[in-house]
Each structure stands twice: as structure tokens, then as C-alpha cells.
Amino acid sequence: PYIKDKINIVNTPFSEQLPLAQLHWIISDENESITVESMSDGLHIYDNPVGVLTNNPPFPQQMFQLNNYMYLSPKQPRNTFCENLALDAYSRGMGGLGLPGDLSSSSRFVRVAFTKVNAISGESEEESVSQFFHILGSVDQQRGCCEVADGKYEITLYTSCCNVTKGIYYYNTYENHQISAVDMHVENLDSDKMICYPVIQGERINYQNK
């Protein structure tokens, strides 16, 4: 049976302090990703070739809108406007002109997709982890830029990734940019007890001359 036949969506908040949210899910291993969406007509599962996701609009619309940006490139553009005009790429990065910069979900999807498919990581795990946080940093929500209610703002509470082979979970938070890690194989994975770690908050600044 398909996985969607075994999943039920319930009207139960994850926490009494948090409201229910219209969430879309991305499920990934080291090679591929799928998107899972619970809609009014049932559960939908899609292959996700770009390996990124934001909430709303539904995933097929997110993917379709990438057609509008097929001209973007990390390379410097050539003059295809008019060969008789001496047009000049006067700044680096002009191959990305038109990449949306607003904070809507659809624009952030395009921006992080472009960043992810073009970003080049180093060979070490540390370089890959660092590059991951740089990629998602391209769509960070800064306090004050997206007001959701009077005096309340959307922010990126935390960013996280996991090495699924080694079982190491990496994260940082809005208040602490240092990357923290939890090695799950240090714990007893056969235990029937939940293991919890406090989320490290508060910026930790490394003073080089103290």
C-alpha cells in the first residue's frame, strides 16, 4: 500500500502555545526529495526535483512558476537585446536580475531554488553544512520586515539540517547564529524514552583579542 493510505491528518495542535498551521512537508534522503501536501481533496505526494519547499501556493504551482525565471543564470549575461547597441554588464551578478527579493512564499521558493541548484559546496562535511546554512540564509525572515499582526512579525526561528548517514542534527536559531549539533548515535537509540536537548539561544560571539 502507498504511504499516503497510512497517513491521517488530525486537527490537533503540536503545542497548546502554537496554532495549527497550513503546512506542506518535504521528505528527503541523500539523493531525492518528495513533497507531501494535505489539500481539501486529499493527500498529494509529488517528486521534488529541486529539493526545496515553501508554504503556499501548492507545489505544482510553485514548480510551474520556475518557467518564468528560466533565463536566470549565475553567469554574466550577454547582450541579446540588440547587437547594434553597446550594452554592458556593468556589475557582477547581473545574470540574476529579476530574481524575486520579496518575502512571499512563492518568491522565496524561486530564490532558494536558484540558490540551491547553483551553489557549490566543498568536499568536507563542515563545508557542506556551512553551505547549507548559507543557502537557506538567502530566504531568512528578519524581524520587522514581515508584519503579521500589530507589533508581531514573521521571523526565521531556526534553521536545521541532518546528516542522515551519520545521524548528526545541525541547527542555529534567530538569536544564535553559531551552528550547534546533536550526534544521535551518542544516545541509546533502542531506548523507549524521549531524549530532549534545550535549544541554545543567545548570540555567542568569539572575541579574538580577549
Regions found by a protein language model. Name each.
Residues P1-P57:
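Structured, non-membrane catalytic/scaffold regions adjacent to prosthetic-group chemistry
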Residues P13-S15, L20-A21, E30-E32, V52-K210:
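C-terminus-biased signal that marks the final domain/tail of proteins
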